[in-house]
């Protein structure tokens, strides 16, 4: 338990950040799941549209430090490859 005034403040800030990050991480997962659902349905147009919406969100979360930039790149590359496989 935090005892000093500064430690209590840090604990409050950490909790606030944890909740904010959890919300953003949930939002990120939701948009990625929408792309995956569109891919599984086999609808190329819907998958492309969902990916166009999800892509900047993935990038934004990487710049905010919520996910690693390599993970963001890997996620986008894999989703894009699956979308291209539908079209072929």
Swiss-Prot record:
Residues 1-27 are annotated as: Disordered. Belongs to the bacterial ribosomal protein bS20 family. This is Small ribosomal subunit protein bS20. Keywords: Ribonucleoprotein, Ribosomal protein, RNA-binding, rRNA-binding. The gene is rpsT. PANTHER family: 30S RIBOSOMAL PROTEIN S20 (PTHR33398), SMALL RIBOSOMAL SUBUNIT PROTEIN BS20C (PTHR33398:SF1). It comes from the Bacteria. GO terms for biological process: translation. Coiled coil: none annotated. GO terms for cellular component: cytosol; small ribosomal subunit. Binds directly to 16S ribosomal RNA. GO terms for molecular function: small ribosomal subunit rRNA binding; structural constituent of ribosome.
